[in-house]
Structure formats: C-alpha cells, structure tokens
C-alpha cells in the first residue's frame, strides 16, 4: 500500500502512439526520474491491446492499463476515462495527474469536478498551431491579435479554436510544463498565462554508452554494407513537410554534384510514392529505413557522420538530444524550439529557414552551405561533435530533468 505521506503521481500515457513518438521516450525518462524521488507512481496506459481493464504492480510501480476505445483518442472518450478514475483513484490532496496529450479540456474539467482535491499537471509536447503555421510564432501572434479578421480564414479559424482549447487547459491545471524558452514566451506573451504557473523543464535522457572509436564504428557499418569512406548524413523522424524533409532532399540533390561519397539515411515512416518519384534520380544514394525502434535507431546514431534536423518546429527534440549524446556534428534549422536547443558554431551549425513557403529554395541552399562546411572539414566536424556532447551533459541529462520535476512537485 502506498504511504499516506507520499505524493501519488498518475502519469497518463497512450500505448499506440507512445511507441512511435517523443512522448513515449519522455514518459520512459520521466518514470525513471520519479523512481528516484520519494513519491508513489501509477502509470495509466490507454488503448492497450487487451480485452479488459487491468491493475498490477511492476518494479515498485502501479500500472492501470485500459483497453482500446472503439473510436477516437482516449481524451475524446473523456466521460469513460473519468469513470475509470472515479473507480480506481480516490481523490486526495497528495494526487498529481500528469497529462501529456492535447487538446483535452473536457477531460481536465471533468477530473477537476470529480477530484477537486487532486493537482493537475500539463506537459506541453505539442502546440497544434505549430504544424500548419510551420512554427511561425509571429504569425500566430498576428492571428490572435486580429481575431475577428482571422475567423474569416478557414485555417486560421481552426488554429484559433485549438489555441482556445490549449488556453483552457492551461487555465484549468495547477501547473504547466514547457520544454523550451520559445514555448514559455508563447504562453506568457500570446496565451497570457500566469508566469507563476509555468515551469520550464527541458527533456532529459539517461546517459548510455556509445560507440566512439573508428574501429567499432566501421565494424557496425560492415554489418549494414556501408563503406567506411562514405559519409552518412542522418535524418530521424517523421518524413513530413513541417519536419523539413523536402528541404533536406533538395539540398542533398545539390550536394551530390560536389560530393560523390555521401549517403542520406532517412529513419522514419516512408514517403508517399508520388514524392519518391520526384527524387528517383538520387534513390541509390538515399536509404529509407522506415520507422525504427529506439534500439535499432541507436545503431544509426553510431554509424552516422552528420545529423541533420531541418524541422520548422520542435518541442525539445529527443532526436536532437540523442544526436548530441552520441557526439554527432549537427546541422539544424532555426525553427521554433530548435533555436533554443542549438547555438550556431557551438553545439551545431544553425541555418536560417527564411520565408516559410512550400518552395523555399533559400532554406535548401542554407542547408547545402552548412553541410558543405562539415563535409569539407574533419576538424570542424570533430569540434561541433565535441560541443554537442558537452551540451548534452550540461543541459539534457536525466539528472537535470529530475531536478526540474522535483522542484515542481515540491511547489505543490
């Protein structure tokens, strides 16, 4: 039985999506942090492939797993979710519910009514306006400021609706965690959230052993039939527009004219056929891995020579943290969130996106310039890689993340 003196932390999770995105990595690391604190943990997992609700204990942690809903996300079925909490979770001043998915204002409100003594914590892993606006927070501010005019635009109307829901969530909960300074500024300057409610806690990652000798790296490459003289440029993540995939492919087409010994590895869900056909002429130089489990992806971090993160928007990217942990020299955009993680000529080469349009040749040209700098200088590659590793150790270790959440929980 849990101690009456300990806080009871209920971490809400979604089984299917957590196996494929950064929220799953975050929850894994958060649970590691909480295990090192004087708290009791309950991992609440929705949409599990099983026929009934199950409650068990594992490794000193309580687990409540809930089967899949007939349709929609678990937060769309908030009435059922609330019944589950009323059945299995007694209200208490020591309870802290940690929400990681959005938008779910109805669920938060219903839980506030059924469990008025319990605290609520909302960790922002995504702001829904960032994808359609390609991370342009200045445009968001203009849309919100000119609300009446913006409502006449279909896309802007949808954005305002999601902003309203996110704002409602922030107002309902007791604390909001943002992962980057950029999100903190949006919450304070555009959403107008009380700063005392906001906690800036960047993601952290447990330190792992990584292959750092050329001999070990080459042995791993042999298993994947990659020549030791070939320079591997690694992109990891969803192959979508807001992740900057088209800018990378266009840049790689240009790079091949100067560098014949390079390979682009795309570790993520496969591109549609009509997109692949546009880049058929470079297909022998591009490796598509499909979605990879973390264990397999780590091998590519070890084999790669350069990491590229061309996203228009991120929320403290775990791909970025993992690349830094492995000491990769990184080329990144100055997109929303990324500009808080990386400093140009420090732990990465940061390239400006420029205008956020579908055919932005300037962005691709900037990527070409940055990648050329690294490919042309082993010294620069080593320097950026060392700085990346130092940045990980200083800012993104599990210890720093644990201290942030301990500070937050102590404030309750």
Language-model regions: role of each:
Residues 312:
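Aromatic "clamp/platform" in nucleotide-sugar-dependent glycosyltransferases that forms part
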Residues 182, 204:
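Carbohydrate-associated surface elements
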């Amino acid at each position: 039985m849990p101690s009456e003196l300990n806080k009871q932390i209920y971490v809400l999770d979604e089984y299917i999506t957590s196996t494929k995105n950064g929220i799953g990595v975050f929850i894994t690391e958060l649970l590691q942090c909480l295990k090192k604190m004087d708290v009791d943990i309950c991992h609440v997992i929705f949409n599990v492939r099983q026929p009934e609700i199950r409650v068990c204990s594992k490794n000193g942690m309580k687990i409540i797993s809930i089967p899949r809903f007939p349709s929609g996300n678990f937060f769309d079925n908030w009435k059922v979710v609330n019944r589950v909490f009323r059945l299995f979770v007694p209200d208490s001043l020591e309870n802290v519910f940690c929400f990681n998915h959005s938008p779910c204002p109805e669920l938060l409100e219903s839980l506030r009514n059924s469990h008025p003594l319990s605290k609520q914590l909302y960790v922002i892993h995504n702001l829904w306006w960032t994808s359609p606006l390609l991370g342009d927070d200045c445009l968001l501010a203009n849309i919100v400021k000119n609300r009446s005019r913006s409502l006449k635009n279909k896309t802007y109307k949808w954005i305002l609706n999601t902003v309203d829901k996110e704002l409602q969530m922030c107002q309902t909960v007791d604390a909001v965690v943002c992962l980057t300074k950029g999100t903190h500024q949006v919450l304070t300057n555009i959403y107008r959230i009380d700063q005392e409610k906001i906690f800036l806690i960047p993601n952290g990652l447990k330190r792992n052993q990584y292959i750092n000798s050329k001999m070990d790296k080459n042995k791993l490459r042999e298993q994947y039939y990659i020549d030791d003289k070939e320079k591997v440029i690694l992109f990891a993540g969803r192959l979508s527009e807001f992740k900057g995939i088209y800018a990378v492919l266009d840049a790689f087409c240009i790079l091949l004219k100067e560098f014949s010994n390079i390979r682009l590895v795309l570790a993520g869900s496969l591109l549609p056929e009509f997109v692949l056909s546009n880049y058929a002429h470079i297909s022998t130089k591009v490796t598509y891995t499909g979605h990879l489990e973390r264990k397999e992806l780590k091998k590519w971090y070890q084999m790669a020579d350069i990491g590229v993160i061309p996203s228009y928007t991120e929320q403290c990217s775990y791909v970025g943290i993992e690349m830094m942990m492995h000491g990769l020299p990184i080329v990144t955009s100055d997109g929303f969130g990324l500009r808080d993680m990386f400093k140009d000529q420090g732990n990465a080469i940061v390239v400006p996106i420029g205008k956020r349009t579908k055919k932005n040749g300037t962005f691709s040209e900037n990527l070409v310039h940055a990648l050329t700098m690294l490919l042309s200088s082993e010294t620069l590659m080593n320097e950026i890689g060392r700085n990346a590793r130092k940045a990980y150790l200083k800012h993104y270790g599990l210890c720093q993340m644990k201290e942030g959440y301990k500070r937050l929980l102590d404030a309750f």
